[in-house]
Amino acid sequence: MLLYPRKTKFKNLFNRKRTKFLNNRIFSPNFKDFAIVSLEAGKLNNKQIELLRKTLRRLLKFQGKFWLNIYPNKNITKKSEGVRMGKGKGNVKFWYGSVSKGVVILEITGCSW
């Protein structure tokens, strides 16, 4: 089950500025066992997030819980190959969630390793 917003006001989102967003706060994990923290700003698409979720579910089984703190709410559009210029914006290629520096992406608790 790939994550993406089910209902949006517009099918294709507007372009955003290409600046890196830096947080002034240091984020700490809420659940205190293990956490994955981003070292740089970047993007995680919905396939990468789903792969992370499936792998953790398989490894943890019923021992522990995990929380994903990222959600893919922005999209990238692209026209198909061989299509001429114009005639509107292209179709949605994939959804992604932006990650800024120092943000907790994932938290794990209750595992024995």
Model-derived segments and spans:
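Ribosome-associated RNA-binding proteins
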Residues: M1-W113
